[in-house]
Amino acid sequence: ADGSLFKDNDERIMFYARGVLETIKKLSWKPNVIHCVGWFTALLPFYVKRTEYKNNPFFNDSKVVLSLFNDEFQGALVETFLKKLKVEGGTQKDWKAYKEPTYLNLMKAAISYSDAVVVAQEGVNQELIDFAIANKKQVIDYAPFEEQREKINALYDSLAVIDEE
């Protein structure tokens, strides 16, 4: 509640990301769009696009949307984060983004592996929005709920690959 990090948040977000993807597989869902909400989901885009999941038939056509909030934490995840993450896969280039696991670096990495970004709240760090634009990501700007909902639905329609089987 005070905004400080738990010492094991690195393991928690890894467990969460892997848990979500393994649950999807177990339930035999094949998502067209995976929408990640908030910093705690920041590893999902990496897992879907750069680890063993990228070649998994459940995820190889999935698009990833990341919603950004004004939920920045101070400090960084533990120093051993990158060592633990390397076990999951990726390349030297991928790991560079996670060398210093601050909020900004985690979210920039998440943006780089996402197909689109939604600014879901006022007060989102402008550096993240600028990073998304510079990396040619489709960005849905913050708007009142109904307006933004319509834009997100249109985004889903534009990204989704419908399997007719």
Describe each PLM feature range.
Residues 1-165:
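Catalytic cores of nucleotide-sugar-dependent glycosyltransferases that transfer UDP/GDP/TDP-activated
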